[in-house]
Amino acid sequence: MCYEWNLDKNKTNLEKHGISLEEACQIFENDVFTWTDERKDYKETRKVSIGSLGDEIIIVVVHTDRNGITRIISARPTNKTERKLYNEHIKKTP
């Protein structure tokens, strides 16, 4: 997979959430739980994925696909509800 992100957004995300957008790409190397974000019209299809960075850190990554490239929009630690969703999904995945 190819990834891209806005460099200014990467800096802001790292300062705010302690996770770089480059680091966030790692979740796609393992099982992820993904759904389409339909909360509002973003003028593009945005997806939300929950996955792990290593064995213990579970994060949420917002992304979109543009011409075959996954553009990372944001990344942050999960909240309690998101961790539960992720764990339930992973247990169901063979």
Regions found by a protein language model. Name each.
Residues 1-94:
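Ribonuclease/tRNase effector modules and their secretory precursors
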